[in-house]
Amino acid sequence: MENLQSILPEDKPQTPVLEPHNFFLYGAPMAGKSYFASFFPHPLSLNTDGNAEQGTAPAIQIRNTFNRDGSLNQNSIYQLSSIVVALQQPGVTYRTVIVDVIDDICTMFEQAICKQYKALSLADIPYGKGYQLLNTSLQQLVLDLKALPMDVVFISRELDKTDEKTGRTDYVPSLKTKYYDIVTGNCDAVIHFTKIGNEYLRQVTQKRANYKKADIKNPAVLKLLSSCTGMFTNEK
């Protein structure tokens, strides 16, 4: 009989591995998000913007396609699932996956689910099943990407929210809060991109740990993250 204790790790403290691999970028159009992401090592862009040809990274256009009768031909949920399986195979040379943009992926998932159930909206699918399917599909995608031995970059647009009392304007990701929580809950850093005149600014708004430059093993990634204000703590 197998010794069940053999599957347990040794009972002693482990040295944390702090190297970040999952990133969430958001900002206004033309703030440099896709350009920045394209400099990650050996990137593959899963593109929804229709501007993949303008970048240097190899890209796959993610989309739902339809038959003449309006029924679903290509399902974006299954398309992305197949891509993840392909990236899991031996000999794959890609080292970064870019999801550009995650907002559109959520919209496509919703559209695919509604078509599958012949509903106009998720609310029309009984017992909340539509919302459950969308949440599950997004969670599965994020977890599958995170499990890859690669860097993963999610890109989102931004919204401006102005407080009527104070007049203060804050810039937040356009991704709905419940989906934002699913994605960023599996990310190591959130980076806000802005462009003022000809200057591009990158500010880390959230991070999982107090990273040091020594935590980053890949020189190309280190160079990218070093350009983001607030990424590294107490280091010049």
Show which residues each predicted segment covers.
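Intrinsic-disorder-associated interaction segments
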Residues: 73-76, 127, 218
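Conserved acidic residues
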Residues: 43, 95, 150-151, 188
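A general structural signal for short secondary-structure junctions and capping/turn motifs
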Residues: 15, 35-37, 90, 144-145, ...
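Conserved P-loop
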Residues: 2-99, 103-108
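Hydrophobic, Leu/Ile/Phe/Ala-enriched alpha-helical segments that form helix-helix packing faces
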Residues: 84-88, 141-145, 187
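Phosphate-binding/switch region of NTP-binding enzymes
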Residues: 152-223
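P-loop NTPase motor core
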Residues: 96, 101-182
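Charged phosphate-binding loop/patch that engages nucleotide di/tri-phosphates or the phosphate backbone
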Residues: 217-236
